[in-house]
């Protein structure tokens, strides 16, 4: 009985770890897409700010995300 409970606890912990790791990978991919789009747009337009309203995330530094409510992302 104890062995069965131990296996169940281990399975739950492994599933939780897999979910957390998957969310972290998705967040990292979104961050890289944002940084790539910001860099490419800044190079082609020659401007300091770029309109990327769909890329608001925790990696953005305020003032851009707070002042422009994710309409503009400033080149830092």
From Swiss-Prot:
Propeptide, chain numbering: 19-45
Keyword field: Disulfide bond, Knottin, Neurotoxin, Secreted, Signal, Toxin
Pfam families linked to this entry: Conotoxin
InterPro entries hit by this protein: Conotoxin
Subcellular location: Secreted
GO MF term (any one): ion channel inhibitor activity
One GO term describing the cellular component: extracellular region
Tissue specificity as recorded in UniProt: Expressed by the venom duct.
Entry similarity comment: Belongs to the conotoxin O2 superfamily.
Free-text comment on this protein's domains from its UniProt entry: The presence of a 'disulfide through disulfide knot' structurally defines this protein as a knottin.
Protein name, as recorded: Conotoxin VnMEKL-0111
